[in-house]
Amino acid sequence: MKQLFLLAAVICFGMAILKAYTAWMSTSRAEPNKGYLTLTPEAAKTRLEENPDAILLDVRTQEEYDGGHIPGAVCFPNEDIQPELPLPFEKDAEILVYCRSGRRSAEAAGKLADMGCTNVADFGGIQNWPYETTTD
């Protein structure tokens, strides 16, 4: 009977750890060998609230940016992120990157990491951003 109780306790403990790990992985995870984090929009919003000095990069075109963007974002098109060009921010700054759907932001985050930026996070596309946007 003691063995059955011990087995049940171990299984319950293991399930609790697995649930906590799954929740942690769904909010942020390091992309292996990519040098940047992938965040949910909710985790990105929390980071922006906790660090008002974080740089929010919209890597879409200027026209897309003008059509609506996240408040506080800076338009820095993915095509303009080139290794031979200087960056307009420090490489150790917290940088959060987004685009329309997530493809360009992942590419931009990878390029920024390759250029030596050490605190880059990609949270995908504005189409998944459930919070306020602006055209200002």
Task: Annotate the PLM regions.
Residues 2-50, 54, 63-94, 100-136:
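Rhodanese-like catalytic fold shared by cysteine-dependent sulfurtransferases
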